[in-house]
UniProtKB/Swiss-Prot annotation:
Listed name of the protein: Phloretin 2'-O-glucosyltransferase
Residues that, per the record, bind UDP-alpha-D-glucose: 140, 360, 362, 377, 380-382, 385, 401-402
A GO term, aspect molecular function: UDP-glucosyltransferase activity
InterPro entries, per the entry: UDP-glycosyltransf_plant, UDP_glucos_trans, UDP_glycos_trans_CS
Native source organism of the sequence: Malus domestica (Apple)
E.C. number: 2.4.1.357
Active-site residue list: 15 (proton acceptor), 118 (charge relay)
Length: 483
C-alpha cells in the first residue's frame, strides 16, 4: 500500500468536506504514487445527516486515491441540560478505541507518514504519539483565530473567576497580533458559558495545539494581517512554551458540484440565469451558511432594509428556527416564503430582486460578474469563497467563532463592513441598519475601495496555490517534515 496520510474528521458534513479538500490538495501536488489518503470518520453523532454517505460515495468514485474508514456506531451519551457541543465532544472521546484500532490496522500494510486531526479530535493526539506517527492539527479558520485559540488557555488562566464570558458585558480581551480587542461576549460560542462542560473541553483542545508536530491552516499568507503571522511565528501566542510549525495551505474550497436534479433544481438554475442578466457588480448576495437562520421578525427587517436600499439582490432565505433565540436550522425543510416576509415584498421588488428558499450554489453565485457584494454570517469557508471570487462583504455573525471572524474581517483585513447588532436583543439588526450598510457597500466610495482591495486579494488567492505560490511552498515544507 506504500505511504499513507491518515486524516481524522470531527462529526458533521463540513468537517469531512474540509478534510477531503486537504487530501485532494496533497495528492494533486504529489500524485497518488507518493501518498494515498485515508479519512477516518465517526458514526452515530447527533449532527450526522443523510447527505454524508451520499457525499462519501461521490468522492470515493471521483477520487479513488481517497479512501474512507467509518468507525462502528457509537451511542451519544445524551444528558439533560448539556449542550450539543459537549455531547459531541464526549461522543468523539468514546471513539478513541476505534482510532487506535484503525491506526494499528492501517500500519500493518502501509507506512503512516502523518496523522492529521481536527481540533475537536484532540483526544486522538496521544494515540498518534503512541504509534510514533507525526500528528498534526488541521484548522479550518484564519490565522487570527488560530492566534486567539493558541492564546485562549492564557486568558483562562488570567480570568479564574466564577463569571462566564457571556456575563462580562463590559470586558474586552486582547489577542497577540490583533489590531482591536474583542468583547468577552463575542468569544467563540463554545467558551461563553464557564459552567458548560464544552468550556473546559475547548480550553483542553487549545492547550494541546502546541503539543502537536505542527498546525495546517486553511488560509493563505497574503490574506492574513502581518502582525498576526508575526505573533504566531514569534511565539507570542504560546508564551509558556514552544509554538509548533504552522503551514498556511489555503484557500482550499470545495469544487461546486453539478446542480442536483431535485425538485428545487429549476429554481437554482433560474437564480443563475437571472444573475447573468444583471449589470456588472450590481447585485448584493445574501446567504448565511448551511445552518444560519433568522426568526420571522428579523427576516422582515432584512426585507424592509433591502427594499429601502433600492439595490438589486439575491437573497437565500431559510425556514425560521423553531426556538426564537436559535440562529441555526438543520436541513432544508419546505416552508411558505410569503408567510415569513412582509406582505407584498416579493411583488414590489420583483424587478430588481430574487429570493430563493434554503439553498443556492454559493461558489458559482459569488463568481458571477453581476455580484458586487456578499452579506455573510462570517463562516470561514464562506469568507474564503468570497475572497477567491474577489467580492467584498457585509459581516453579520451568528454563532461559533463568527463574531471573532467579523472583528478580523472588518478591522484587520479591511475586506468587510460590519453591521451594528444589538447584543442585548440576541444580535438583532434593524431594517434601517441593513439599508445603511447595503448602500455603504454598493454605492459609496468606501465600498468601491473595498471592492478593489478584494479583487486584488482574489488574484493573490489564485497565485498562492500556483506552482511558486506561498501555499504550495508551505505544503512542500509540510511534506518535507514527514518524509
Amino acid at each position: 500500500m506504500g505511504d499513507v496520510i491518515v486524516l481524522y474528521a470531527s462529526p458533521g458534513m463540513g468537517h469531512i468536506v474540509s478534510m477531503v479538500e486537504l487530501g485532494k490538495f496533497i495528492v494533486h501536488r504529489y500524485g497518488p504514487h507518493k501518498f494515498s489518503i485515508t479519512i477516518l470518520y465517526t458514526c452515530g453523532s447527533i449532527v450526522d445527516t443523510a447527505s454524508i454517505p451520499v457525499y462519501i460515495r461521490r468522492i470515493s468514485h471521483s477520487h479513488p486515491f481517497i479512501s474512507f474508514r467509518q468507525f462502528p456506531r457509537v451511542t451519544n451519551n445524551i444528558t439533560r441540560n448539556i449542550s450539543v457541543p459537549a455531547i459531541t465532544f464526549d461522543f468523539i472521546r468514546q471513539n478513541d478505541p476505534h482510532v487506535r484500532s484503525a491506526l494499528q490496522e492501517i500500519s500493518k500494510s502501509a507506512t503512516v507518514r502523518a496523522f492529521i486531526i481536527d481540533l475537536f479530535c484532540t483526544s486522538a493526539l496521544p494515540i498518534g504519539k503512541e504509534f510514533n506517527i507525526p500528528t498534526y492539527y488541521f484548522r479550518t479558520s484564519g490565522a487570527a483565530i488560530l492566534a486567539a485559540f493558541l492564546y485562549l488557555p492564557k486568558i483562562d488562566e488570567q480570568t479564574k473567576t466564577t463569571e462566564s464570558f457571556k456575563d462580562l458585558r463590559d470586558t474586552v480581551f486582547e489577542f497577540p497580533g490583533w489590531k482591536s480587542p474583542l468583547k468577552a461576549t463575542h468569544m467563540v460560542q463554545l467558551v461563553l458559558d464557564r459552567n458548560d462542560p464544552a468550556y473546559s473541553d475547548m480550553i483542553y483542545f487549545c492547550s494541546h495545539l502546541p503539543k502537536s508536530n505542527g498546525i495546517i491552516v486553511n488560509t493563505f499568507e497574503e490574506l492574513e494581517p502581518p502582525s498576526v503571522l508575526q505573533a504566531i511565528a514569534g511565539g507570542l501566542c504560546v508564551p509558556d512554551g514552544p509554538t509548533p510549525p504552522v503551514y498556511y495551505v489555503g484557500p482550499l474550497i470545495e469544487e461546486e458540484k453539478e446542480l442536483s436534479k431535485d425538485a428545487d433544481a429549476a429554481e437554482k438554475e433560474d437564480c443563475l440565469s437571472w444573475l447573468d442578466k444583471q449589470p456588472s457588480r450590481s447585485v448584493l448576495f445574501l446567504c448565511f451558511g448551511s445552518m444560519g437562520s433568522f426568526p420571522a421578525a428579523q427576516l422582515k427587517e432584512i426585507a424592509n432594509g433591502l427594499e429601502a436600499s433600492g439595490q438589486r439582490f439575491l437573497w437565500v432565505v431559510k425556514k425560521p428556527p423553531v426556538e426564537e433565540k436559535s440562529k441555526q436550522v438543520h436541513g432544508v425543510d419546505d416552508f411558505d416564503l410569503k408567510g415569513v416576509l412582509p406582505e407584498g415584498f416579493l411583488e414590489r421588488t420583483a424587478d430588481r430582486g430574487m429570493v430563493v428558499k434554503s439553498w443556492a450554489p454559493q461558489v458559482v453565485v459569488l463568481k458571477k460578474e453581476s455580484v458586487g457584494g456578499f452579506v455573510t454570517h462570517c463562516g470561514w469557508n464562506s469568507v474564503l469563497e468570497a475572497v477567491v471570487a474577489g467580492v467584498p462583504m457585509i459581516a453579520w455573525p451568528l454563532y461559533a467563532e463568527q463574531h471573532m471572524n467579523r472583528n478580523v474581517l472588518v478591522t484587520d483585513m479591511e475586506i468587510a463592513i460590519g453591521v451594528e447588532q444589538r447584543d442585548e436583543e440576541g444580535g438583532f439588526v434593524s431594517g434601517e441598519e441593513v439599508e445603511r450598510r447595503v448602500r455603504e457597500l454598493m454605492e459609496s466610495e468606501g465600498g468601491r475601495v473595498l471592492r478593489e482591495r478584494c479583487k486584488k486579494l482574489g488574484e493573490m488567492a489564485s497565485a498562492a496555490l500556483g506552482e511558486t505560490g506561498s501555499s504550495t511552498r508551505n505544503l512542500v515544507n509540510f511534506v518535507s517534515s514527514i518524509t
